[in-house]
């Protein structure tokens, strides 16, 4: 890939008046502001530190983490859970199982604890957090019980979702101890089951789910940061998808790059050890635009980035992500 150099790009910043806003605000105003901020895409500072390997990773269950890989997740933002308790996960499993069966069998009485054809399992995801202060992530699964009496078969997983918080200190500072901050919810499975799960959580913990779209701006950040990750091996090309609005239907442009070429390009623009800056992201993307224009005479900057895919993960602007490989140490 041809090298290119863009100087003098201004860094885009999004300043926050969160601290000033909360001075004198009522508890209700604080919660409303928290909801608004969670629903406005991912925060986009002008620079981000590259997380180092944490001692928390020693607690991670490799089997559970492997289960989360290679699945497409639809992401939602989530307001804090009121009166949620990790010690009650077994009770939540029984209550949610009964709720799902009752919703699927409208008009039929259902007793909690009854033997259903489905079951729900709540379990913690130890180590899936950024700091000790972050609340523990947890996994929710809907399973279909095997109906075969002749042979023992594993229950079939119908739906999976997990709740997590990574480096969420700023969120926890705005709520009381009665609330558990797990601002990110990821779901894999039928939308009907996702809807049931959301309904139950909203009724039980007085929370609110919102679909979380990923802007083209944040997709650029993801592309740069994932390209920067050190990998044991590269299994997939780095791909970008741009959407060109036109009539009568839109046109998509796909751009595939060898992962080692993408890595070399990133290393040529990355000058700040331990962090990624907005200027570096802009340089990285503008080099791609320049290279593409040189060969195809198309200005990608005039289109809209809708998907990025790397050896680490992929993400789409409609709020769908997939994690492919673990980062090497």
From Swiss-Prot:
The modification Phosphoserine is found at residues 40, 54. It holds the Pfam family CENP-L. Keywords: Centromere, Chromosome, Nucleus, Phosphoprotein. GO terms for biological process: chromosome segregation. The keyword Nucleus applies. One of its GO terms (cellular component) is nucleus. InterPro entries: CENP-L (IPR025204). It is found in: Nucleus; Chromosome, Centromere. Belongs to the CENP-L/IML3 family. Component of the CENPA-CAD (nucleosome distal) complex, a complex recruited to centromeres which is involved in assembly of kinetochore proteins, mitotic progression and chromosome segregation. May be involved in incorporation of newly synthesized CENPA into centromeres via its interaction with the CENPA-NAC complex. Component of the CENPA-CAD complex, composed of CENPI, CENPK, CENPL, CENPO, CENPP, CENPQ, CENPR and CENPS. The CENPA-CAD complex interacts with the CENPA-NAC complex, at least composed of CENPA, CENPC, CENPH, CENPM, CENPN, CENPT and CENPU. This is Centromere protein L. It comes from Mus musculus.
């Amino acid at each position: 890939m041809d090298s290119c150099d863009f100087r003098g790009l201004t860094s885009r910043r999004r300043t926050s008046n969160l601290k000033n806003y909360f001075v004198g605000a009522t508890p209700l105003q604080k919660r409303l502001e928290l909801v608004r901020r969670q629903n406005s895409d991912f925060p986009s500072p002008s620079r981000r530190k590259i997380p180092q390997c944490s001692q928390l990773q020693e607690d991670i269950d490799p089997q559970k983490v492997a289960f989360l890989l290679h699945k497409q997740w639809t992401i939602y933002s989530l307001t804090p859970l009121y009166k949620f308790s990790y010690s009650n996960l077994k009770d939540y499993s029984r209550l949610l199982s009964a709720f799902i069966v009752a919703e699927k069998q409208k008009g039929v009485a259902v007793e909690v604890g009854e033997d259903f054809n489905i079951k729900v399992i709540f379990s913690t995801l130890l180590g899936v957090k950024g700091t000790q202060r972050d609340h523990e992530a947890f996994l929710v699964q809907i399973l279909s019980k095997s109906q075969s009496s002749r042979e023992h078969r594993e229950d079939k997983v119908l739906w999976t979702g997990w709740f997590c918080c990574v480096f969420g200190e700023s969120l926890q500072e705005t709520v009381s101890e009665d609330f558990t901050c797990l601002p990110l919810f990821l779901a894999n499975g039928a939308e009907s089951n996702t809807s049931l799960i959301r309904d139950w959580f909203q009724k039980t913990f007085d929370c609110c789910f919102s679909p979380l779209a990923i802007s083209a701006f944040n997709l650029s950040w993801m592309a740069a940061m994932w390209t920067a990750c050190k990998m044991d091996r590269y299994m997939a090309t780095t791909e970008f998808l741009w959407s060109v609005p036109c009539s009568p239907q839109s046109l998509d442009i796909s751009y595939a790059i060898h992962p080692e070429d993408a890595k070399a390009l990133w290393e040529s623009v990355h000058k700040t050890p331990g962090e990624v800056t907005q200027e570096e992201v802009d340089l990285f993307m503008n080099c791609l635009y320049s290279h593409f224009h040189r060969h195809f005479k198309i200005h990608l900057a005039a289109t809209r980035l809708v998907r990025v895919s790397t050896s680490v993960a992929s993400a789409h602007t409609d709020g769908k992500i997939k994690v492919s490989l673990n980062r090497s140490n």
